[in-house]
Amino acid sequence: MKIYKLSFLLLIILQFSCNSQVKKINGLSFVASRDSIDAKHINPALRTNSNYVALMPYSFIRNIEIPKIEFNTNREWFGESKNGLLQYAKEFQKVDVKIMIKPHLWLRRGGFTGDLKPTTEENWILLENSYRDYILTYAKAATELNAEILCIGTELEGFVMNRPIYWQKIIKEIKEVYKGKLTYAANWNEFNRIPFWGELDFIGIDAYFPLSEKKSPTIQEFENGWKPHKKDII
């Protein structure tokens, strides 16, 4: 399977080959809100020349001691729910903007999802089963929308590294219901340890690499700061 390298920032830039033509994808993350959207929300995105948008249905773990994932509840904002995702995506599709569905897990009090590692087998199973329900719900939504890309997870290093067999199985289950392109959004210091890149179509990196310790670095200093990271990625 051909693997493409993909960097996720607020602005997502993706290149891929199609019919021998190299097409550049200019993508942005569209933050969910309380309400439905219409042209007045979409037009600013179009003015950035974006032709892809990442839509982010959220889920929550309210107590990491009981790591059950909750999603699509009446406590969420509309844009964070499945119905909100469907409405947002259809509005963007009306103006020929393509869709990546990028589910996000949020831990109460802002804990880092990469550190999520249950301490008992019972809690691991609780996490796995609830994540399965969550990601398959949005894999089915991706199929319903004919979305071009589905991100199967975002910055979940502890989960991924401690339960590799689970992730191999869940990727297979996702592929049974969704036939589009798959990626995973690895944190910048995690990407070279992810064991399942070969099962996906894109290598996703949340590329917040440290580039400079200066308060006001020059463009050249930024470029120099990128060089070692670029070398590691390539």
Task: Mark where each language-model region is.
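Bacterial Sec-dependent N-terminal signal peptides
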Residues: 1-22
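Substrate-binding cleft and catalytic face of glycoside hydrolase catalytic domains
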Residues: 51-67, 83-160
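The substrate-binding groove and active-site-proximal loops of carbohydrate-active enzymes
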Residues: 27-32, 68-82, 120-132, 153-162, ...
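Glycoside hydrolase catalytic-domain groove-lining segments
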Residues: 79-95, 102, 183, 192-199, ...
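Distinct, well-ordered alpha-helical segments
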Residues: 42, 112-113, 162-170, 187-202
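Boundary/entry segment of secreted carbohydrate-active catalytic domains
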Residues: 19-47
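Aromatic-lined carbohydrate-recognition surfaces of secreted/lumenal glycan-active proteins
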Residues: 100-105, 151-155, 159-160, 168-192
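Alpha-helical scaffolding within the catalytic cores
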Residues: 36-41, 133-138, 186-195, 230-233
